[in-house]
């Protein structure tokens, strides 16, 4: 999936997450996580984000994650919404998911 533009998904409310994405000129993934629960769940948050990016074959992006204690399902939903917005597609290819 090609990320074409800046996009934001989520809020800074307790129990939610705000994620910002921007395209990069390289194929790197620049992931910055700021979380109120980073000591306990930082690695799990990072793993979830990288799993979703891998599933949709996303590379060459900068991600800024401001987590306020979001559950894993919320993190995934926000990230998938963000990818759809940033790539300019109306919906993700659900039928291709495994």
From Swiss-Prot:
Belongs to the CitD family. Keywords: Cytoplasm, Phosphoprotein. Pfam families: ACP (PF06857). One of its GO terms (cellular component) is cytoplasm. InterPro entries: CitD, Mal_deCO2ase/Cit_lyase_ACP. HAMAP family: CitD (MF_00805). This is Citrate lyase acyl carrier protein. It comes from Salmonella arizonae (strain ATCC BAA-731 / CDC346-86 / RSK2980). Oligomer with a subunit composition of (alpha,beta,gamma)6. Covalent carrier of the coenzyme of citrate lyase. It is found in: Cytoplasm. Its main location: cytoplasm. The modification O-(phosphoribosyl dephospho-coenzyme A)serine is found at residue 14.
